[in-house]
Amino acid sequence: MAFIEKGQEIDIEAIKAATQLSPEALRKKEARDRELAAIISGEDDRILLVMGPCSSDNEEAVLEYARRLADLQKKVADKIFIVMRVYTAKPRTNGDGYKGMIHQPNASEAPSLINGLQAVRQLHYRVITETGLTTADEMLYPSNLVLVDDLVSYHAVGARSVEDQEHRFVASGIDAPVGMKNPTSGNLGVMFNAIYAAQNKQTFLYHGQEVETSGNPLAHVILRGAMNEYGKNEPNFYYETLLNAINRYEIMGLENPFIIIDTNHDNSGKQYMEQIRIVRQALLNRDWNEKIKKTVRGFMIESYLADGRQNQPEIFGCSITDPCLGWENTVALVEEIYTTLTK
C-alpha cells in the first residue's frame, strides 16, 4: 500500500499561462458572470439553463455543440440565460469507468493526468473564446479549483461530494455561483447544511496554507432526485418537494433562495426523454404557485448532438456516460420553454 509518483510536480501556473483570456474575452465573460449572479440573486427574472453533455469526452464534438448552443442562446436571450455544461471530471460510484477528460483526454486511450489538465483548460478556453458562452463544471476535486478558477463561471458540487467538509468550505470561497446537489439518499437536510456552510465564512487548511473564506451568498439548491435502498429512483421535482425545499430556505434564513431542477439522473431515472416531461411539469408548478415561480428558476439539462448514449466513442457527439437529449430535441425543448415563458 503506497502512493507511487508517476511524474514530476505539475506547474499549474505554466499550464494556465497558455490559456489566459484576453482582456476583451475577459470583459465579455465578466459581463455574463454579472448577469448570472443577478439571476441567482433575483434581480433578473430570466430562467437559467445549465445544459450540455453529461461528460465532455471529445473536444471537437463539444465545440460543435457549443457553437449551436451559442446561436440558440441569442434567439432566447430575453427570457433564458444559458450556461454550458463542460463537465471534465466524472464521479464513479465504485471507482471504475470513464472519469472524465481530466483523467483521459482521449476517451479511447490510456489515462494521462498531465495531458488531461491541459485539455480541460483548453476546452473551457475554446468554448468561451470561440462562442461567447460561459461554462459550468463539477468541482469533483476541490484541490483542482486553481486550475479553472479563472475560466469556469458556475461550479456544481455533486451528490457524492455534498456531505464532504472540504467541498463545502472551498465552495464558501469561490467567487462564482455554486450549486449544491442533494445526496443520492435524497436527504434535503444534508444539502441545506452544505449550503449553509458554503454561504458562511470558513477557516481551514487549503494547499498547505491556513485560509479564511468570505462566504458565498450564491450557493444554492440543485434537486437531482434520489435512489432508495432497493435501487429505485425517487424523483424530487414534484410540487410538494419544491414547497418543502422553499420552506427550508425560509426556516434557515439562507441568502438568495434559488432552486435548479436537474432533469436527468434520479429525477428521470436516466431515461433521457423524460427530461422534457420534467421541465413541463416544473413550468406548470411555477404557474400554479407564486413561491415556486419566485424560487424555482433553473434547470440542469443533459443534451448533446445525438440522442442517447454509447459504450464506446464511435458516434460523433453521442454521450459515453449518461444518455442525453440529441440536438433536435434540445432545440425543441428550449423553444418550448421560451414559448411558455412568453405567454
Where are these regions (language model features)?
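Active-site-facing alpha/beta catalytic cores
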Residues: 66, 79-244, 248, 265-270, ...
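N- or domain-start disorder-to-order transition segments that initiate the globular core
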Residues: 1-40
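Conserved, mostly hydrophobic/aromatic
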Residues: 52, 261, 326
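Short acidic, Gly/Ser-rich segments with clustered Asp/Glu that frequently serve as metal-coordination loops
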Residues: 54-57, 256, 264-270
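Internal helix-turn-beta structural module
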Residues: 303-341
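Conserved phosphate/anionic-ligand binding catalytic regions in large, soluble enzymes, centered on
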Residues: 48-61, 322
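Glycine-rich phosphate/diphosphate-binding loops that line cofactor/substrate pockets in enzymes
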Residues: 37-45, 251-256
